[in-house]
Amino acid sequence: MFKFQKEQEIANIAGIKVGGQPGELPTLLAGTIFYNKHEIVEDAAKGLFDRIAAEKLVNLQEVGSDMTGNPHMVHIFGTTQESITRYIDFIAEVSESPFLIDSPEGTVRAHASRYVSEIGLADRAVYNSINMSITTSEIEALAQSDIDSSIILGFNAMDSSLRGRMEMLETGAGLLEEGLLSIADRCGIVNKLIDPSITPMGNGAGIALRMTITAKAKWGYPTGSGIHNAPSAWNWLNRQKEKNPVLYKICDVGSTCLQQAAAGDFILYGPIEYAQYVFPMAAMSDIMIAEAVADLDIEPASRHPINLLV
């Protein structure tokens, strides 16, 4: 393992710390709820869902966090303004954790940024995400909100190389008038969480691991990804899924360790149902990484898995 020469920033999101040197803080884990075709969702447009089942899933993640010391966030996914409003209200009611607000629609994300500001929850909200498709109206909504934490996505549709992704953040890569980091500054984002973006395997998925190290070395911001999207989009693995679902789950969950070994600070691990597997696996990786840097003057946090589970 290694220690970055660049000073590493530690973001504080509603009391949850993320970032730092490898082995310093436990990995922040975020499971997704209300995702596409989630069986607990009864009406995705209206945001109707099985509240009892949803609370059990949130509790499952919190139990994993309490056991291992790995902090957690709830990754809220909504497709309409009505649905994401209901989802935010529910998560705020049953959990005190930070949460990500995510939608494929920029108008929904913009609405969510205004809504959490109106109800006093902006300090717990992480915007997902500032990316190359962000619109002027979305930038204005985010800038006018009280949100100060956001994922900044390094996806570059024209050039998925390491250079293309880094330039998207720094300069806009010739596709935007300014880099995404500059846009984040204009929006008042203090806690910048860099996501290299996960492309399919065979189309540069592994570049995200290299970019994690490169971005932390260059800027020092907390960096991580939804790395499970690589195996979940792997055609070969999907063909095995029906006859061997355990194999699929092992690869999906196991990808967590790859991001951690590449100095990742946070992981969007996918369906929140996987919390029971992800938290012990992430804790194992955190322990081994902490041991690997023990002679590099990196002191693990008091609630690091190495201090709770060893």
UniProtKB/Swiss-Prot annotation:
Keywords: Methyltransferase, Transferase. GO terms for biological process: methylation; one-carbon metabolic process. InterPro entries: Dihydropteroate_synth-like_sf, MeTrfase_MtrH/MtxH, MtrH. Its EC number is 2.1.1.-. It comes from the Archaea. GO terms for molecular function: methyltransferase activity. Belongs to the MtrH family. May be part of a complex composed of 3 subunits; MtxA, MtxH and MtxX. This is Putative methyltransferase mtx subunit H.
